[in-house]
Amino acid sequence: MSSEMCPVCGLPSELCICEEVAKEQQRITVKVNRRRYGKEVTVVEGFDANEIDLHELSTYLKSKFACGGTVKGSAVELQGNHLSRMKAVLVKKGFSPEQIKD
């Protein structure tokens, strides 16, 4: 077997469920901030950067909302106000709806 083992759960990397378990345990906060010149930015924070690939999540959210964005610390910032659709997209991505606070 040439498969690598997950250092957290000990399962082969193809069967690793660490990221799915981590998604259900995150307490996520979604809010909209106003920046310079009245621009709105949707900030999604509360992720554990060690357990979830924030750059992959950022890329997914930017493509879903057709906007620009970035990762700052343990938060994902998206250009524009996406508060109304964010919870549904995060639930579809595998996050627990009870843990997402608007």
Curated annotation (Swiss-Prot):
Gene3D superfamilies with a match to the protein in the record: SUI1-like domain (3.30.780.10)
Keywords on record: Protein biosynthesis, Translation regulation
Keyword Protein biosynthesis annotated: yes
GO molecular function (one): mRNA binding
Lineage top rank: taxon: Archaea
Gene Ontology biological process terms in this record: formation of translation preinitiation complex; regulation of translation; translation reinitiation
Recorded family membership: Belongs to the SUI1 family.
UniProt cross-references to HAMAP family, sorted A to Z: SUI1
Cited NCBIfam families: PRK00939.1, SUI1_rel
UniProt-recorded name of the protein: Protein translation factor SUI1 homolog
Originating species: Methanococcoides burtonii (strain DSM 6242 / NBRC 107633 / OCM 468 / ACE-M)
Lineage, opening ranks: Archaea, Methanobacteriati, Methanobacteriota, Stenosarchaea group, Methanomicrobia
